[in-house]
Amino acid sequence: RPGGNQTAVERQNSVNQLFETMRLAWLELIYWTRMYMMSVDSGADAKEQYAVEGRLLETADAITDVFAERLPVAVTRQLRNLLVEHVEMTGQIIRTLKSGDKENYEQQIREWYANANQIATLLADQNPYFAGKETRNLLLNYLDMTREIIEHQMNGEYDQSIDTFRDLSDLVLELADYLARGLLAR
């Protein structure tokens, strides 16, 4: 509309779209992570693993795109780089645990958590809404659950992996809604 005047209905539709897009992006991240984990765990051929990992990497762009309209370009670029790093680290963690290399696994976990802290700090630096502990806590809870899922899966504890994945699905919806609210509060 000329002059940027939106009706109440258009504003509400825009808000609804933000929440929906953020939720979908985070759900895709966990679903493609699970698919990648399952392809590694099942010993799928390298071509399949590569294809799934490629699609998993696209989820970093999907999440970044939700933030792109509401953050400066340089910050969006930083966020994308951190999310790509996160996804790549997740893949490496899955492969390392599958190989049985516990020492490297623990080191990679520490780096993964440091990456999540960097994401929380970046968001907090841009938006006071994200400055509290909730941003970091939600991201760390997401990592805790993802780690549990990976460990259960690689230990053949499939029921526990599925149960934790169900809980993770609920958590990322909470995380997505929190992030969307923060973007609106900006």
Name what the model sees in each region.
Residues 57-91:
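Mid-chain, structured segments of secreted extracytoplasmic proteins
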Residues 1-61, 92, 96-97, 101-186:
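C-terminal amphipathic alpha-helix
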